[in-house]
Amino acid sequence: MKLGCPSSLACAMLTVAGLLAAVPAAALEPAPARLDYQVDEGLNINRFVREGSVAAHLVLRSGSDPRILIAFPAGDSGVGVWFAHRSGKIRWMLQGAPRAIQRLDGRGRALHGIVADATIEAADLQIRQVLLSSVRVLRDYQSLGAAPAAVGARPVVQARAISWSRDRLDGAAGYQLTLAVTHGGLRGERITAASDGRIGLRITGLTGEPPLSALAGKDLLNDLASSDSAARNTLAFLAYREKLLAGSWRFQTYFGRDTLISARLLMPVLSETAVEAALASVLERLSPQGEVAHEEDIGERAVLDHMERDGSRSAVPVLDYKMVDGNYLLAPVASAWLVRDERGRSRAAAFLAAAAGPAGGRTRGAALSANLRLVLQSAIGFAAQPDAAHLIGLKRGIAVGDWRDSESGLGGGRYPYDVNAALVPAALAAASQMKESGLLSPYLSAEDETLFARAAQLAQVWRDKAPRLFAIHFSHRAAEDAIRSYAVSLGVASEPALHALADGDLTFPALALDGAGHPIPVMHSDEGFALLFDDLDPARVDEAVTVLLRAFPAGLMTEVGMLVANPAFCAPSVQASFSRNAYHGTVVWSWQQALFAAGVVRQLARSDLPAAVRAHLAAAQRTLWAAIDATSSVSNSELWSWSYADGHYQIAPFGSAAADVDESDAAQLWSTAYLAVRRTVVAVGAASGARLAVRTRARDSMTANEAALQ
């Protein structure tokens, strides 16, 4: 969950003047072709439209709690209407393609949006709530059932239409939503069916936020990208010159972690323009100390933040720095592009010399050096005294800090495994690579040179010492008992898991350490970070793929994918926090599978692994890709859950069950990774960061360019 900052006291924030200034589009370039596609997932019809200055995501939610929502990448804005709960389930039907429109508000200011026609079989629809504001406001209302009173809008009821409109809270151009009844009747805020039991609506949603500049065609992808149209559509909807959006509908703005992970996984198939847009967006938003911004509040969400903090109605973006993992993701991703990829290397000096933001100030090279300095300084304590107290912990008073950023995602842990055992050593190694390349020389002081010279040695200490603190060990008998008990509680078969366990004891890394340094024995998928970013000890590689890809609940593998967590070896109270209804529970996240798959390929490219380890890697690769191929229909979604019947796991869209704590985005940036991540990869030039010759998945034919490189 991308948790926001409910108040200025909840997390560290920084306002940055100048982020509102959009990167100017190339005015002479032709406009991208119209993008129009639909994803039906669970109870949601998701229709995505991008044409000219309009980009919009229409969500029609069926079931017993119907709603209509339109989210706009422009300003992370949206409009939505929630209808009263119904005893029976009803289903929307979209009639034809939505149309992109532009209108002027009452003061002559431009509004951009869509018009769509939809029908539903229902006796009536009683309007319960209407919101026109930031998507953050709509998202929080959907999750928490509350919205700021300041964003309310009064309805204007006519004979056959009801509409809401208002300016943004700072007086800027705002939002409009109109429901025109094309079939049925309207009585106040109650829409009634015609004699045939159907309701027809013409839905118009508009925003006054400035449009973004779409990345498309060769400005987005090169010829090595998979031909998967669903993934291409998703990426095209989320990619802009100003930034890459994390997902839709709920995360239609910048998220540092999502940007960096996606850029790394997609790097072989992204254009130079797209990779540099991603990196530039992160560098632009770094704090003065070099911290990576987790999320930005823009548009009306920024206005609301300022109203709460200082009483002003400023729209200057507000940046949130509460996460810790992003600080250690920037270096390995930047190094992969600027040092290891021949395309990026040829452009690196000019890229780093450019200003880090539209307001001027420091260069990108200076900003990157600030981040690397932060990484190195934070690593010194553990290198001197390698104990839990000197690991990288969550920030004081904040319960989240890595990608598992729901309140229970780390099981109450304070020291995440992924940050300490994978990302810190990877960041230190990357800092060493970038220093040795000479790219950073214009930006480093004499003191920096001394500090950066320690990077490789610090990386080795962290690589050797940190994982040991997370080690969990169960005897064979204890592991069997835990697996049987947990399988019974879930109503799933234990036999495949027990068979996969074989005769040995069970060892795996803990998800996190608690505040006292004790391991939390949740099995997890985060070893994928280490597989992708580092040259691991062969024994660690073997343990990662052997243990994690065992059948659940001995490991993480199911027929519907690799789960991101397995609490079988925890107390029942902890198991309850990691259910298949929990956002970071026993569910499948598409990008985590892609990360692990890419990591396996990277390890297979090594020449120093024993034959037995390579054999285990190859077997793990076959197992993982069988699940990836079997779930290709949902691979562009954020995550999914599962059901179990007749001895088999089945995909269950996350957010469809009443017990699900949230819903999945139908379009997620890092879930498009399969445009680049394939079953086998042969590096051409500079390792996994360079252009790649690829043999695609079975369902995707090999392109001519790929064939020429084989």
State the predicted function of each range:
Residues K2-R232, L238-K243, G247-T253, R257-T259, ...:
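Terminal accessory carbohydrate-recognition/targeting modules of carbohydrate-active enzymes
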Residues F72-R168, L330, W337, L451-G517, ...:
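Low-complexity, serine/threonine/proline-enriched polar segments
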Residues E189-I191, W249-F251, G411-R414, G515-I520, ...:
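Generic recognition of flexible, low-complexity loop/linker segments
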Residues K243-S248, R257-L265, S312-V316, S406-G412, ...:
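Glycine- and acidic
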Residues Q252-A384, A421, V541, W589-S607, ...:
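Aromatic-rich carbohydrate-recognition surfaces in CAZymes
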Residues L283-A293, A355-R362, A551-M562, A618-S633:
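Short, mixed-charge aromatic SLiMs
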Residues M307-E308, V318-D325, V339, S346-A429, ...:
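Extended ligand-binding clefts on enzyme/binding-domain cores
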Residues R309-W337, E495, F508-L513, G517-A544, ...:
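C-terminal capping/lid segments that line or modulate ligand- or cofactor-binding pockets
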